[in-house]
């Protein structure tokens, strides 16, 4: 199976030992390796695919822990660099009674921000099918140009470029700066994944259909929208599918969207969907992919932290997905 390559932040999430209280009230935390791009390729690898992470950590215990966790998940960490210029980033998380999150980030700057375009070479894209990235590392640091270089190389190889903005406003000087960076990179993406609460912020459109048409006009070939408890939807220029959410007990929503898009990308690569065939996916195919990813994400939210399930675990929970 060809590879899904993700570039972006690596950090430690400190997840709370209790739910239903504000971040300032949390009394103890548990260390969990995190970063949305890493969660995505962990999902791909845990499902039996081939995931590659491109990033940088500090020469510290937290960086070593992240690399260990990724390797244990089957992720190729050959392109995870180490630096003494900065420490590995940290994020402290609180959970309300429904499992939704509040973040406090410590990365001023963090090691991933110093990943340079010179560290991104053509060999990275060997046997690559998809390049995935988010917006957290699109700040005005060397890592932004590293993203540009990775996208350029992926384009040269005809890979699918996937962008999940994964908006994290506390990391930006202003919402306007965040929006501008996202919109700068939207034209690079063949597949865009948005949550329903990001849709208007990112696109300026009030409805999914309007957002889809706007993105298609800019070159996007597939839009995925996650709606939280209301399910998910997929749009191509010629097809549409939607699915209701699965009702499960929610422990923690951390990594839910990452597990959704990671399992979706796994299916695209498994089925050898290419840049040319992506916009031609039919309603039935889109629906099957949504069913699979909804099931996979439902397992993630039942666990604390972004812990990705294996394919046998998914099929044991939902045999109809086999």
Which residues does each PLM region occupy?
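Conserved N-terminal subdomain of the carbohydrate kinase-like
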Residues: 50-133, 316-322
